[in-house]
Regions:
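A short Gly-Trp-Pro
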Residues: 17, 26-60, 66-144
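Bacterial signal peptide processing site
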Residues: 6-8
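C-terminal motif of bacterial Sec signal peptides marking the signal peptidase cleavage site
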Residues: 2-4
């Protein structure tokens, strides 16, 4: 089992050129970021730094800096991970069927770098009906 590490992120700034190999991603990301973003891992529930985060701004992809969600789309879903009801604009998030762990889910990844973000569910409480359930480790934040 993966043990979360306390290693600080190696970079929080957007990259113009993305790593072209897994070795490049390993050099760019912390061990925990690599596990979640590149190996489709999941952080433990209720441990992420953005779970109770309430500042106004933009949640970005930790892998490439792409803006994914605005803070006004974030809500408390009581699921243990940050939740959002819509992406910042169509096309920044890619959805793929995920049949692992004996469940049928929809995986969400960053459309630019392919980094694993989490999953989207159709049980959201807002008018979109969606709940983008995202690992905090997959996210960065830009203040408004």
């Amino acid at each position: 089992a993966f043990q979360a590490c306390s290693q600080a992120p190696k970079s929080t700034k957007p990259m113009d050129q993305l790593p072209s190999s897994e070795a490049g991603w390993k050099a760019k990301l912390s061990e925990e970021e690599y596990y979640i973003l590149r190996q489709k891992g999941t952080e433990q529930p209720y441990t992420g730094k953005f779970l109770m985060h309430v500042e106004r701004g933009y949640y970005t992809c930790r892998g490439c800096g792409t803006r994914l969600f605005k803070s006004d789309s974030k809500f408390d879903s009581h699921c243990g991970w940050p939740s959002f009801d819509k992406e910042i604009k169509a096309g920044v998030i890619k959805e793929t069927a995920d049949l692992t762990l004996g469940m049928r889910r929809i995986e969400i990844t960053c459309a630019k770098c392919g980094g694993h973000l989490g999953h989207v569910f159709d049980d959201g409480p807002t008018t979109t009906g969606l709940r983008y359930c995202v690992n905090s480790v997959s996210l960065g934040f830009e203040k408004e």
